[in-house]
Structure formats: structure tokens, C-alpha cells
Amino acid sequence: PSCTDGLMAFLGRLAEERGLPVQSHLSENRAEMAWVRQLHPDCERYWEVYAKYGLWNSRTVMAHCVWSDEEERRAMREAGVTVVHCPDSNQNVFSGVAPVRVMLQEGLRVALGSDIAGGDHLSMFDNTASAIRASKARRMMDNWETSFLTVPEGWYLATSAGAAFFGDAPGFAPGNE
């Protein structure tokens, strides 16, 4: 919600013309979501604001997605948007606990990030541990119906899942960056 309509339109054109990736926030907290609805009454859903400006496609990375409901998750999956889960930040600024297991089960592309602006750690080891703890909290919130992330899954989200967005092969093979 910090960009004008003109800037959003420019960024959409620039990303399209140059094939650039786009990173932003989506459904991080309820106050932000209400603010976006006020700023864009023509868009029924938060994600539609990005789509309106050409910023909603397979080159899009959306951080947080804590409060993304089934419809928003479907829209992300269909567009090929990558979710970047930032558990340390989400916990630190009281955003909530993202339904990462549900996102993975629904076929969304999910990677792990630090969002150092709101989090405490740049270390992906620390953020992996935060993601696993957050998934355990989410499991309790979901009445024990979802499983929590395992260590291998957490490490995959911290490494190969993010690399896949940039077209790199998964794993720690020679030549991977």
C-alpha cells in the first residue's frame, strides 16, 4: 500500500518489458489488508491489485501470505506466484502464523525468507528452525489436522525452493549458486 497507482503501473510495465522478477508483501496482517481494501475499492481481493498492474505472474514473489485464504492461495497457484514464508518476522511483529503445510499440500511454490526488516536473523539456519516451530504452532491452531514441517522440508524451503524461482536446479550440486 506504499506505492501510488502511477508507480504500480510503471513497475508493471517495467517488469513486463524487461522480464524482471517482482517481490512484494501479501496478506501479512489484517490491518494491512483493510488498508489495501480502502485504497483499492475496485479490487475485491488484495491480490487483484497486483494483477491489475501486471504484477501477478510466475515472476512474482509474495512475502508473508499469513492470512491468505483458499481463494487467494488458488490465485497464487494458478498464476505461478511463489510464496516466501518469513516466520521470524511474522512472529516478531505479531502478524500470525502462515498455513505453510496447507500451501504445500495445495501445490503452491513456497520458499523461506528472513525479512530482516521485521525479523531477528539473517541466518537461514535460524529461519529454518523458526519455520518448523511456526508450523508446530499452526498445527495446534488447526486442531492438530495439519502436520508440521520436518527438518528436511524446512531446509528444502530455505535452499532449493528459493533457487527454483531463479531456475536453478535443487540441491547442492557443482555450479549451483
Predicted ranges, named:
Residues P1-T82, F94-V110, P170:
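Histidine/acidic residue-rich metal-binding segments in metalloenzymes
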Residues E32, S89-N90, E145, D168:
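Glycine-rich, flexible loop/turn motifs
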Residues K52-R59, R101-E177:
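His/Asp/Glu-enriched, well-ordered alpha-helical/loop segment
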